[in-house]
């Protein structure tokens, strides 16, 4: 099975947020991303792997801190060891070459992208913060149960707590993808990409920026 959609992508680091004025004098919140440089460490083809994809490496790491299989993998690609590896499935993988550098200029202004990262950890959270429950009334007979979830199941039918019930627990540190964010501008010289809106994760966290899947499908490009 072949992937018919062409995907561009780059790995980067979240530097923080700021705000800029656009051409219509509107204040726009943007996320600053240090995009790349990435290198191509592997190219997968339908003939050898059964699908078409390209593997990107990002972030420097000392050679002594990688395993022997990883060291052999990087040596085969002819690149220095990288801390992060991400595979992007794309129809044009055969056009990439081992060791090719991918930078912020892979995207241009007004492109739409999907940004994937790891959300901020919030620790143990109740149902109101974690799932948006409304809670109980603040007064009129409610006795110290204002933020409780309420009933979690019947006593005899079904007589158990249903699997997957939303309850209090650890919140955050999950893989999250924000879709259809627009690229505000790209500074190719400094490797900086400004994306409108917020993206997952704290400052300094790893991000994967790729072509927007739903925008491509809407424009007639098969996913």
From Swiss-Prot:
One of its GO terms (biological process) is translation. GO terms for molecular function: rRNA binding; structural constituent of ribosome. Keywords: Ribonucleoprotein, Ribosomal protein, RNA-binding, rRNA-binding. Coiled coil: none annotated. InterPro entries: Ribosomal_uL3 (IPR000597), Ribosomal_uL3_bac/org-type (IPR019927), Ribosomal_uL3_CS (IPR019926), Transl_B-barrel_sf (IPR009000). Pfam families: Ribosomal_L3 (PF00297). The keyword Ribosomal protein applies. GO terms for cellular component: cytosolic large ribosomal subunit. The keyword Protein biosynthesis does not apply. Part of the 50S ribosomal subunit. Forms a cluster with proteins L14 and L19. Belongs to the universal ribosomal protein uL3 family. One of the primary rRNA binding proteins, it binds directly near the 3'-end of the 23S rRNA, where it nucleates assembly of the 50S subunit. This is Large ribosomal subunit protein uL3.
